[in-house]
Amino acid sequence: MNSIKIKLSVIANSIAIFALSILSIISFYFTKDSLYQSTLYTETELLKATQISIEDFRSRNISLLNTLEKDILKLPYEALNSQDNIVNNVGVILKYYRNSGNLLAVYIGLDNGENIMSSDLSEKKNTNITINGKANNYNATTREWYKGARNSNQIYITPAYIDAFTNEYCITYSKALYKDGKFIGVLGIDVLLTSLQDQIARTPGNTFAFDNKDKIFAATNEALLDPSVDHSPVLNAYKAHGDNNFFSYKLNNEERLGACTKVFAYTACITESADIINKPIFKAAYIQVIALIVMISISVILLYFIVSKYLS
């Protein structure tokens, strides 16, 4: 009789252990998936916040450039048909926009290579503008901002670059100026990225933005702005998975998670250590294992006594 009790108890307990193990595995899977989806949603929302910041920054500066263009083109052609006329009639407008728009510089590049500019230098000299040109071996027509706008006949936005005077990242927005169908010059504004950087720095999470040459120009972690940092693992993972799709990659032997999306010519990304998901999962797994052991122990004891009672 005792032999039968033991055999039945073993069979019953084996079934119970198997069932509890299956339930624990299923529970672990759903916990992991829930944490994954929750993290993906949070990271995507933070990425959207960065995306909106970049879009607003771009829209604001394009609007400013278009408004400046309209104000200049209100002048008759006779006020714009020579370098001297532009200096005399437009110089005050360039200075006003630089100050009111908090811009690094505002200028018009002419087809003779001269650049009529309102900047900190003109401010120091107490004049509306200064002229960059042959006198200091400068040729506006060879510059990217000039050629890009002149050749495309639309607003041209340069990749981010470090300004030589402020040592800060900035971007140039430029546009060809025409009056009565005649080319006047290329209008440009230099915009510091400090305001965008400050806005992104306040965004929770590890967010950053690449320009169209895959160079980071704004980031929550300012260490990422260092040009020597290799960002190819993130970029390669993004290219393989596409916009707004979660991906994993290795960085310095550490597993990381991320998501990126295109914002015009830029790429906004957010990345985190895989521990953001793995730690809660391992914690949940540990708790489930302990609970499973306790439940199995209780079920073994209960089933043994139940089997013993009904076979006695």
Where are these regions (language model features)?
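Solvent-exposed, extracytoplasmic
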Residues: 84-100, 182, 186-224
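Generic short beta-strand
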Residues: 106, 175, 207-208, 214, ...
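Short, acidic, Ser/Thr-enriched surface-loop or helix-capping motifs
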Residues: 110, 178-179, 210-211
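Extracytoplasmic/periplasmic sensory segments of membrane signal-transduction proteins
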Residues: 41-49, 57-154
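Juxtamembrane interface helices immediately C-terminal to a transmembrane segment
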Residues: 9-10, 27-57, 78-85, 277, ...
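Extracytoplasmic/periplasmic ligand-binding sensor regions of membrane-associated signaling proteins
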Residues: 99, 118-191, 196-199, 248
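Extreme N-terminal signal-anchor transmembrane helix of membrane signaling/transducer proteins, especially
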Residues: 1-41, 289-301
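Extracellular/periplasmic juxtamembrane segments that couple receptor/chemosensory ectodomains to their
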Residues: 178, 213, 222-289
